[in-house]
Amino acid sequence: MPQQLETTEHKIAGSESDASFVKPLRVLMIAPSLDMLGGQSRQCARLREQLQQEPTLEVAFLPVNPRLPGVLRKLQAIKYVRTVVTTLFYWAALLLKAHKYDVLHIFSASYYSYMLSAMPAVLVGKAYGKKTILNYRSGEAEDHLQNWRTALPTIRMADVIVVPSGYLVELFARFDLRARAIFNIVELDRFSFRERRPLRPVFLTSRLLEPLYNVGCVLRAFALIQKRFPEASLTVAGEGFLRAELEDLARELHLRHTTFIGGVAFDKMPQMYDSADIYLTATDLDNMPSSIVECLAAGLPVVTTDAGGIPYIVTHEETCLMIPRNDHNRMAEAAIRLLEDQELASRIAHSAREHCRKFSWATVQSEWLNLYQSQAHENAEEHRYREDGSRKNAVGVE
C-alpha cells in the first residue's frame, strides 16, 4: 500500500474491558518505507506488522521518504530536488505528528541519512519531551561516529540506543556510547526449508550494487566457478549506481548464464531464495545482514566474507562458509567445496536452520515490549516528579 505523507496508524483493538483498564502505549516508528528497498525498511515493516498485533500498543508509522501529494510528486523524479522536497515534507510531518506519541522508535543509518532523517527525529523527540529509541543499523558506524561532528552529541541525546548485533554494541562502547543488542527478526514461516539434493551450481547474490557490497568480487569468483562447472548460473538481484559497471565486468569476464534482474520486492524474496542452491555475498563492511539469516531459514547454503558483524551471527563450517574480504579466489574455492562435498552443504543447511530460530519474533518479542514499557514507565515517573516539584513550588510561593 502506498506510503502517504501522513502517518499510517493502526490501533490494536482489545476487548472493551481491556480498553477500560489499560491505555495502549503510543509508539511512532520512523523509518524508510518499502518504496526504498533496504534493511531498514524491511526490518521496520516486519517489526511493525508484529507489534500491531500487541493489544498493549498503538503503533503508527512515519516514513522518512513520504510520497508527495498530487503534482508535487513529479518533483521527486528530479535528482537533488527530490532530496530537498522529500526531506522538508518529512520534517513538517515529524513536527506535526511526534507530539501525539509516548515513544519515538527511530530507525537510523549513517552519514547524510542520519543527519536528514534520524537526527531531526531525536531532536524533535527531546523538544516534545518524548522518549526516543535510536535503532542504529549501519555497518559504517565507526567511520560515522569518528568523522562526523554532529553524530556523537546527538546520538547521546537518545534515551536508548538499540543495535542489531553484539558487533555494534562493542563498537559503540569504544565511543563511550551504551547500546543494547536486539536481533533483526526473520519470520521463519515465510521461508520454506528446501533440502537441496543434489546441490546444483545455481547461485544467487542480492546486495545493493554499490562499492560497499563488492559485487565485483562475486562476479570474479563466479568466473572461476564456471571453469569448474560450465553450466553454473548466477542471478544478481539488486539495484545501485554500479549496475552498468558490473554488467560490463560480467561481459569482460565472459560470464555465461548470468542475469541482472534489478531490485526484488520484499515479498518476492522467499521465491528468489528457493530458486537458488548457493548464496554468495562479498560485502566489505556490514552489520547484521538480514539476507544471510533469511538464507539460513530457507536452507540456502551461504558463502560470505567475514566483514563487520557477520561473524557475530554465523560461524564458519557450522552455519556457513566464511572467507576473508575481497578474496574472489577463496570465495570460488568455498563454493566449489560445497558442490563437491554435499554432505557438508547439507549439514551446514540443517544447522543453520536451527540456528536462525534465535532471530524469530517469538525470541525477540519480549525484548521490544519490555523496552517500550520501561521507557513509558520512566516517562511517567519523570512527569510525576515534575508535577510534584510544581506543587512544592506553588506551596512555597503561597
Task: Place the predicted regions along the sequence by residue.
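Conserved acidic donor-binding segment of nucleotide-sugar-dependent glycosyltransferases
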Residues: 316-317, 321-328, 337-342
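Donor nucleotide-sugar binding/catalytic pocket of nucleotide-sugar-dependent glycosyltransferases
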Residues: 155-192
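Conserved donor-binding/catalytic core segment of Leloir-type glycosyltransferases
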Residues: 26-30, 195-226, 235, 239
